[in-house]
Amino acid sequence: IIYEHFGFTPSTNKETYATRSFNVGGNVDGKNILSNNPDVVVDFMTTAGTDSPDQFAFTNQPNHLVFFLYSLFKDDQELRQNFLDFCRVQCFAQEQAISEERQRTKRIFQDRAKDMYQKDIKPKFRDLLDNCPVISGQDILPQSVLGNSKNKERYKVAITYHLQNLYRSAGLVDDLEYPKTQSELASKILLPIEPTLLDMPLSNAEKKVKDFLDRSPHDVTVADIVRQFAKVPYGWADCCSIYVVNELVRRHLYAYNYNNNPNVNREDVARNIVRDASRFTIEPAKAISQDILNAFIEAWKHIFNVVSIK
């Protein structure tokens, strides 16, 4: 029912939000039905220790999106009994028939159960899925968000809200400035450094990465940055995280050390940084003298025929 109603299948267990896709896992009453290593988990609960969505939300894990069917399911005695009978028939059908008469009996029960499933159980469960409370972490989705959405649309609205709620800093790199592919990243790494960049304020994404680097008690590699900013609350794509690091290097706040070589040119960075992220260590940059900066600015003005730099 869940697979059909929400389009929730192993072949569609990824959801894209901001700059990357996330693995989606699924549980029915704690039993895994989808993905073993998920970023987010969708739970369908027909039983729980409380029938209060608010109380259940209080102990819910942050990355879990819950369709809390129990608060409605527990009050529908007819559905509960029919579902129990249906499950019993399925168990009975698995038993080996010891006679032709018993086999006929099994077929009769199976046909009745199939009819009950199609006419009663399935429609009512679909209705529960479309009307039950939905919980994202410790927040109950407001009706203003869910609206009158049904079926796959309701699931899409809920999972999008959940990803927004969980990865609240994903939008920091969801902009045209940031590369979407490795080739775009390489092109941006190879761009010449304009002198004005050194005086421009840091972006919010750059501030986050710089703060992480400044607080780290040990050497940090580009791979460490990628892992850290793929986590909650960021959820950044690898290319975006590497781009932010590289912008801090271009500002001369940090420098790369590649395979114990501190003198790394842009071409080597562009060619190798994605593949060898664990071999690129990020170190504080050495101070540049004012004379060198002035000479660089004068050379840049001469090359590009610029009279002054504001």
Annotate the PLM regions.
Residues 1-310:
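Extended alpha-helical interface modules used as scaffolds for assembling large macromolecular complexes
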